[in-house]
Structure formats: C-alpha cells, structure tokens
Amino acid sequence: MALMEAWYPASRAESWDRVGLIAGDPSAHVTSILLAVDPVSAVVDEAIDEEAGLVITHHPLYLRGTSFLPTSDPKGASITRLIKNDIALFNAHTNADISADGVGDALAQLVGITSSSPLVPTGIDQAGRPIGHGRIGSITPTRLGDFLDLVAERLPAGPHGIFGSGDPGTIIERVAVSGGAGDSFLEAARESGADVFLTADLRHHPASEHLEGGAPALICGSHYATEWPWLPILERKLVQAASTANVEVRVKVSTIITEPWTSHRPTLGGRK
C-alpha cells in the first residue's frame, strides 16, 4: 500500500472519487497480486483461481457508497467472496489518471507520443514531473487514417472498437489523449493545438458541437480499452519494486475483458 500511495497519492484524487484500500488487512503480507480495470465478479473468480492475496483495480467498487452488503447484490457478493478468501481489494482511480506513470502516460506511450505533457496540468510531483489530466505530445507526422489503424492495433481487443472523425488523408503530428470519459476535455484538446484527440465515452452532442467548431479530429475508443494500458506499466513497477526489495511477489494483469459489451454489429438500415 505504501508503494501505491507513493506513486499515486490519494490526495490527488478528485473530491468525488473513492480510492485506496476497499477491503483487507493493510499489514498483511501478500505474494500474489492481480491487476484489473474493474472489480467485477469475473475478476473475483480469477483472483480466487490465481490464489491472489491482493487485487488492484482502477475503478472503485463503491463509487457512491453503500449501506448494505448482501450477497444477493453482485457487489455485496463480490466483496463477501474476497473477504472469505482472504483477498484484499485496492483501487487507484483519478489519482492514477493524473500521476506520472499513470493512465495518461500509458495511453500516450501506447500510441507513440514522445515528450508528452499534461493536457490539463494540475501541479508538479515530488520528482519535479508535471502531472495532470490527459497528455499531449508529438508523433511522427502521419495520415489520420493510418494513425486510426495504429490505435486500433494497439488498444486491447474488444467488441467496441474505435470510432474516428476527420479526413483520413489529413497529416497529423500533435496528439492529445485522455483515458476514460473525455467529454470534459474537448475544449482543452482544442486549445492545446492538437490535430487529433484520442479518448473514450464521447456523447453525441458534445462531440457533434466540437466537430462543428473544427479541429482537432476525434478518435473514440471504449472506456475499458483506453484505461487498460496502465495495467502493464503498474505490473512492471510492482515487479521492479519487489526485485529491489528482494521480495518474491507474483504480479499478473487480469485476462478478463471487463467491457460491458460482448458483441458489435454495424447498422445497415436507413431511408432509401
């Protein structure tokens, strides 16, 4: 827990967020850690099968709190099963979004952005690195259509896929990214001078109004897919820290795709 707090301090989380140890003994010794985006029942199954002592997720189990934990409720059942199997649950959410080596950096690195900086700066960390929401930087100049293909190849597989806007032949160089819901950063992406903004969960009206105003072009992936790239980075950090401390810990990224959608079909109807 001390490592997670050092890398992704809870004080950086948004006021509405819930981050930290959700269940478990903070002093317990663990030898196996499972990493996932969402604390859903399938991830709990995997944690039990893997005999994990700790599950670290990006999203909290109870963002808005609860007064009851019956096993008749899916979340109540999950937390009960975790406790019965002596598995702790921890999460880092918006504090991981803005921190160095967090969700923003992971997505930027995945799509080849170099020398990125926060799209919406919030401060400087203890190491003197700028932190904040999203990232912006440069890639080798390329056609928008080719960049769309690259994003599709590198994001984790899932039924959602990606959506793109703009002329695919346009040459782009400045790229802004924000993992997860990106509606609130559309204006920041425009003001940054980005040629394209990669994010997720864009709603119809904000996206349409943004595009009416011109650049940047938009690429919309799924919430899960744009936040998942952080997990391999966290895996490496935990493994390296364990090696430095001469401690044996097995760390694994969950194999469960926690997209809510399981299938996709292009719509083909319309007026003739």
Where are these regions (language model features)?
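Hydrophobic structural segments
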Residues: M1-K272
